Amino acid sequence: MPFDGRVAPRIQIFTSYHEVRLMPVDAELESPDDWFTTDRLIAVVEGPSVVIRTRIHTGFIWAAVHSRATAPEPLEEHLRAGGWEVAEEEDILITSPLHLCEMGGMSGIRDAVVPELPGLHRVRVLAKGHVLNDPFEQVDFEEEFEVIVWPTDTPAPRARAIDPAMPWRQRLPRP
């Protein structure tokens, strides 16, 4: 998949019910089973969609989506270089363009990811400003996410990197 020129600028996107999605326009709008008991911190692949978990119930977050022809730098290196707090990545089967939108699919970026060829891809989600303690705590802050998608021939296990300076790191489950 050569780079197709579709790099979403860093934009504000509306989030509802703590979720933003990267999904085909015709995908089912179901939430992951239970975010508060899952070991995923910021992202989960559900079928053809990536569900991004925000700390903001209803409001705006910052997000950017990058479609690449090759894999980016290693996860830990990317986390440190960009000042990100947490990063997760896993495989996704992409068969049609993906749109970045809020849970209801009403607003966002159409065709944020357009694969040259359908098939196995890797998706990496990085977050800043994502407080990970009490899920019911109401905090005023800005969240920022970066989503990177690239093709891959080989399935890989889900991966996670966490900034060791974050005070909540001891309370997080292992990937």
Residue ranges, per PLM feature:
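Internal, hydrophobic beta-strand segments that form the core of beta-sheet-rich folds
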Residues: 117-131, 143
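Extended, solvent-exposed segments with strong compositional bias
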Residues: 76-117
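Short beta-turn/strand-loop junction motif enriched in small, turn-promoting residues
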Residues: 109-110, 130-132
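Primarily secretory-pathway and cell-envelope proteins
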Residues: 1-80, 132-175
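Unusually extended, aromatic-enriched hydrophobic runs near protein termini
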Residues: 94-110, 123, 159-175
